[in-house]
UniProtKB/Swiss-Prot annotation:
This is Large ribosomal subunit protein uL15. Gene3D superfamilies: 3.100.10.10. It comes from Deinococcus deserti (strain DSM 17065 / CIP 109153 / LMG 22923 / VCD115). PROSITE patterns: RIBOSOMAL_L15. InterPro entries: Ribosomal_uL15, Ribosomal_uL15/eL18, Ribosomal_uL15/eL18_sf, Ribosomal_uL15_bac-type, Ribosomal_uL15_CS. One of its GO terms (biological process) is translation. The lineage of its organism: Bacteria, Thermotogati, Deinococcota, Deinococci, Deinococcales.
Length: 154
């Protein structure tokens, strides 16, 4: 027996019923009954509709806030020290599994220590992280506008 010869067991698969396709079976109302809200296309109430009374969601108080700031993929200094190599860009960090979400910018933070000279290409970095990398003989390369901000912080 070969892979292309495999077939499902007899009677285990059933064709989908095509409704509303002529008078041969489920035609006219297509199993929806006559008239009424449930018979219309796009019918149905929202999942939180409670028959017209104030919904539970509107009765409970609001909590927290939505942060309008940028959400970063965060990398710690200590994580860089464990990795092989001395130059880290986004691709290298993704390969190492430190960056998971590709649509988020990468930020370097100063948690942990870096004991060798490394070059790091990131979208943002804390001032303490930049100092720590430079103290170890390395450098942090940021987009232009951010580089000036980090230098002012020193």
């Amino acid at each position: 027996m070969k892979l292309h010869e495999l077939k499902p067991a007899e009677g285990s698969r059933k064709n989908r019923k095509r409704v509303g396709r002529g008078p041969g079976g489920t035609d006219k109302t297509a199993g929806r009954g006559h008239k009424g809200q449930k018979s219309r296309s796009g019918a149905g109430k929202g999942s939180f509709f409670e028959g017209g009374r104030s919904s539970l969601i509107s009765r409970l108080p609001k909590r927290g806030f939505n942060n309008v700031g940028t959400t970063y993929e965060v990398i710690q200094l200590g994580q860089l020290d464990v990795l092989e190599g001395d130059t880290f860009n986004r691709e290298a960090l993704e390969l190492a599994g430190l960056v998971r979400r590709k649509n988020r910018p990468v930020k370097l933070l100063a948690t942990g220590e870096v004991t060798r000279a490394v070059t790091v290409h990131v979208d943002a970095a804390s001032a303490a992280a930049v100092k720590a990398v430079e103290a170890a003989g390395g450098k942090v390369i940021l987009p232009n506008s951010q580089t000036e901000d980090a230098q002012k912080a020193e």
